[in-house]
From Swiss-Prot:
Record-level GO cellular component terms: cytosol
Name by which UniProt lists this protein: tRNA sulfurtransferase
Keyword Acyltransferase: no
InterPro entries: Rhodanese-like_dom, Rhodanese-like_dom_sf, Rossmann-like_a/b/a_fold, ThiI_AANH, ThiI_fer, ThiI_N, THII_Thiazole_biosynth_dom, THUMP_dom
Binding site for ATP: 183-184, 265, 287, 296
Disulfide links within the chain: 344-456
Active site per the UniProt annotation: 456 (cysteine persulfide intermediate)
EC number of this enzyme: 2.8.1.4
Catalysed reactions, as listed in the record: [ThiI sulfur-carrier protein]-S-sulfanyl-L-cysteine + a uridine in tRNA + 2 reduced [2Fe-2S]-[ferredoxin] + ATP + H(+) = [ThiI sulfur-carrier protein]-L-cysteine + a 4-thiouridine in tRNA + 2 oxidized [2Fe-2S]-[ferredoxin] + AMP + diphosphate; [ThiS sulfur-carrier protein]-C-terminal Gly-Gly-AMP + S-sulfanyl-L-cysteinyl-[cysteine desulfurase] + AH2 = [ThiS sulfur-carrier protein]-C-terminal-Gly-aminoethanethioate + L-cysteinyl-[cysteine desulfurase] + A + AMP + 2 H(+)
All copies of domain Rhodanese, residue ranges: 404-482
MF terms in GO: ATP binding; CCA tRNA nucleotidyltransferase activity; tRNA binding; tRNA-uracil-4 sulfurtransferase activity
Originating organism: Escherichia coli O139:H28 (strain E24377A / ETEC)
Pathway recorded for this protein: Cofactor biosynthesis; thiamine diphosphate biosynthesis
Length: 482
């Protein structure tokens, strides 16, 4: 099988040296992602496209899906590459390929040509289109808004029969821009803002301020791992977790109620800036949107920015909540966000929308900054690829099994789409479907006299969810890894 990768248009207008660098980086990113599916595949870069050739036909759908999620790719063409002799040969091959698709449809033919030939692209379009129209009686030519467009590419003595076109996410290849540190809470905003910076070519590391215990951190780890695995797995990134409960406790005890929200955000920026400096990261990323909550007025945002020299990027600053939720739905983080607890909004009963710098600084004089230094020093830094291994260490009390007993039920916790694409069937045991994002609210409705064996393809989500359910008091869960 063969795929032709078309570059994001902004890449093609760069200078020659920059364009070549971007293409080289994108080629490396594609190799890094696809090697998990087929180690023998070939990735070949050209001036205006990248070719991917693979031998394992069983991985065709997985490879195609992975390509649509790599930043820097505008669209993917799945093609059949065959030799041809003349225009009539092109027509005959197109007839075999497209006859079934064109039955009873309106169609047009579009051709791109490279190389030296005694015919033009329009000549091929007319010849092939006329031939298809004659040989498929129920088909009809329609040059504007046809039901089917027959795409052909001619390159020297090769004909590319385009079997399908699939849109990519666009943007710049990860690694073409500098690293950033995303302040991730697991909600709608931070997930979308992280994705937007990945799509713009940044390697996104994650910094999480834990305000709600182990269960909260597990949920945010899931979001970060999902974003990385889906859009940024070509690069290694860090997940830094900071236990911010001591800082919140100090704020609740010593800071005036109205100033708590702004001061909490200032403390987070201070801590994140220290982490960014430690790892040589150039900017912080937040999901703040203008006027969304009390701390996100222009006055308050300016005061928050003032505590650090580190650049703070806010890609969602002009977005409304509906737009953000729609983006979260598109990238797949909506269900995570809906079940994620929100802690920041509850610590202040009457927050100020226009904080005064003098008052904020006066309140912060009451704060013991050694507490902030201590939590940053004790921050837990993990390679995001090791989340599964770390979870295995943390859930030693959760048994992993490769078999089952008479009272066991396998619980498939993959997303609905994954379950529909690849249903799980295991002989001799019942399999129940319950997506991971519904476990927190629906697991208690299941028969608690049964033992539930949580399963997902890679075992990451099942381990994270097993730990979460254990913390909620459910002792009838195990991890199933056949």
């Amino acid at each position: 099988m063969k795929f032709i990768i078309k570059l994001f248009p902004e890449i093609t207008i760069k200078s020659q040296s920059v364009r070549l660098r971007f293409i080289k980086i994108l080629t490396g990113n594609i190799r890094n992602v696809l090697k998990h599916y087929d180690e023998t595949l070939a990735v070949v870069r050209h001036w205006d496209n990248i070719e991917v050739r693979a031998k394992d036909e069983n991985q065709r759908l997985a490879i195609r899906d992975a390509l649509t999620r790599i930043p820097g790719i505008h669209h993917i063409l799945e093609v059949e590459d065959v030799p041809f002799t003349d225009m009539h040969d092109i027509f005959e091959k197109a007839l075999v390929q497209y006859r079934d698709q064109l039955e009873g449809k309106t169609f047009c033919v579009r051709v791109k040509r490279r190389g030296k030939h005694d015919f033009s692209s329009i000549d091929v379009e007319r010849y092939v289109g006329g031939g298809l129209n004659q040989h498929i009686e129920s088909a009809r030519v329609k040059l504007t808004n046809p039901e089917v467009t027959v795409h052909l590419e001619v390159e020297d003595d090769r004909l590319l029969l385009i079997k399908g076109r699939y849109e990519g996410i666009g943007g710049f290849p990860i690694g073409t821009q500098e690293d950033v540190l995303s302040l991730i809470s697991g909600g709608f905003d931070s997930g979308v803002s992280s994705y937007m910076l990945m799509r713009r070519g940044c390697r996104v590391h994650y910094c999480f301020f834990n305000l709600g215990g182990a269960a909260h951190e597990i949920g945010v780890r899931q979001v970060a791992h999902y974003l990385w695995n889906r859009f940024g797995s070509s690069h290694r990134v860090r997940f830094v977790a900071i236990n911010f409960e001591p800082v919140v406790g100090e704020i609740l005890e010593k800071i005036d109620d109205g100033q708590m929200g702004v001061i909490l955000k200032r403390m987070m920026v201070r801590a994140a800036s220290k982490v960014a400096e430690r790892y040589g990261v150039q900017a912080l990323v937040t999901g703040e949107a203008l006027g969304q909550v009390s701390s996100q007025t222009l006055t308050n945002l300016r005061l928050i920015d003032n505590v650090s020299d580190t650049l703070i990027l806010r890609p969602l600053i002009s977005y409304d909540k509906e737009h953000i939720i729609n983006l979260a739905r598109q990238i797949g983080t909506e269900d995570f966000a809906r079940t994620m607890p929100e802690y920041c909004g509850v610590i202040s009963k009457s927050p100020t929308v226009k904080a005064a710098k003098s008052k904020i600084e006066a309140e912060e004089e009451k704060f013991d900054f050694s507490i902030l230094d201590k939590v940053v020093e004790e921050a837990n830094n993990v390679d995001i690829r090791e989340i599964a291994q770390q979870t295995e260490q943390e859930v030693v009390e959760v048994e992993t099994v490769n078999g089952f007993g008479p009272n066991d039920v396998i619980l498939d916790i993959r997303s609905i789409d994954e379950q529909e694409d690849k249903p799980l069937k295991v002989e001799g045991i019942d399999v129940v479907s319950l997506p991971f994002y519904k476990l927190s609210t629906k697991f208690g409705d299941l028969d608690q006299n049964r033992t539930w064996l949580l399963w997902c393809e890679r075992g990451v989500m099942s381990r994270l969810q097993a730990l979460y359910l254990r913390e909620q008091g459910f002792n009838n869960v195990k991890v199933y890894r056949p």
